[in-house]
Amino acid sequence: MEGKPEEKHGKENKKENKKEKKEKQKEGKKEKNKNENPKKDNKNKPKGTEEESGCKIPSTIFKVDESGTIDYTQGLDLYGIKNIESNDENIKSSEIKGLDNILKLLIDKKVLCGGRNIEKLKSNKKIFLVYELIFNDHINLALNEIFILDIIKSLLKENPDLNLIIQIADDELYSKGKFKFNQVSKFAMEKLENVLKYLTSGDTKFKIHVFSNTSFRLKDNNYESLVSNFKMKVSFERLTKLFNITDDDPVSAIDYPCYIAMATNPSLYTQYIPELTNEYTCLIINSIYNMYRYQLGYDAAQECKFNEPILLATKIISPLTGTNGYECNFNSQDDITLLTGDEEKSLRKKIMKHSVSGSRGNGSMEDHKKFGGDVIKDISCQYLAFVEKDLNKYNEYIEKFGKGELSCGEIKDIMFKCVNEMFKVVRDSKNVNVNDYYFIKDN
């Protein structure tokens, strides 16, 4: 009789073991599917872990705490970015008109991380701009991209003789082995058109020159030769660490970073743009999130004997949801990322529905007026620093929200209007013939 309960218990154990075995098999299948189809897990993947784009490094450098605050310290040190004061003599004496005012505005709104080699701006007319067209999930532009393009456009307006080189890093996509040539070419053209729509809207004509790495390297022996020599000398360890290249990546994955680096060499363009001699210095303006992509430019400058590039790094824009990473266009979720392809109605809906509010107390209007709004937590307040171009208006909005004089809904509406105004430029612009801007034509 005593053995029966044990026997019964043994049967239960067998049942449990079978159940556990089934669960393990189930989990194994899930894990296998997850590995085979990484895109299916994108919803739970925090922004900043862009595995398919090759941009995994920033997520390990820029830590995001529970409140959504980003710590820039490690990135600033790693990329040699130093703080810039609004009265910096190098900026004030720069021959690039309007640069001091633009940077002062960014500094006052606390959205500029700093710069590297800014002493090269002092009394220097021989500057050219490079903007890299980075591939991601969308042909549409995200707010972080529009913000950078707006800074560049402001400089071009003040300096119509300033040359802007747009480099299309299409070879990066080929190195992943997931796209065919025609797919990448079409994708590049469509995204480039959106970039050009924003930059060329208005009456002023700018000196904009475009090239794609794949096409240029086939047609210009000098480009291919410079990069080939550089690849032989660059530190393999540094290259793989910066771009997080692993043993699983194809050999071609070590190529595209070297082509990106060589784009800062002015002599590369002299044949097509005669004024860009070796005396010129490249200026790159981008989010600090993307600054890892330009670090090899310093290695290339030393090896190939041209001027080291100047970097100006802006802060990272948080996502609408506030606490899960970066408003980065890579593998992002359409419903919480602001894109130029959004119609006015859907753009407003995204902002009103998903942007985190900085309300205090119990969330009622009464408590909001009593305790004021949290301008640090509120996403609309954060975004206004990037999209409101009038400093007085920006300060007024922040002050009123902090005092509870502007509601969460009202500050969201103000932010929506600013973003929509910028996006409308792309949305409402006429089609642009991108081929007109290539300085080396395809036959």
Where on the chain are the PLM-derived regions?
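Non-catalytic terminal extensions that flank enzyme cores
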Residues: 1-139, 159, 281-282, 298-371, ...
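N-terminal Rossmann-like or analogous alpha/beta NTP/dinucleotide-binding catalytic cores
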Residues: 39-40, 45-269, 298, 428-431
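Intrinsically disordered, low-complexity coil segments
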Residues: 178-179, 200-205, 217-218, 273-279, ...
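Short, well-ordered alpha-helical segments
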Residues: 189, 291-295, 409, 413
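Positively charged, phosphate-engaging catalytic surfaces used for nucleic-acid and nucleotide handling
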Residues: 207-339, 343, 347, 378
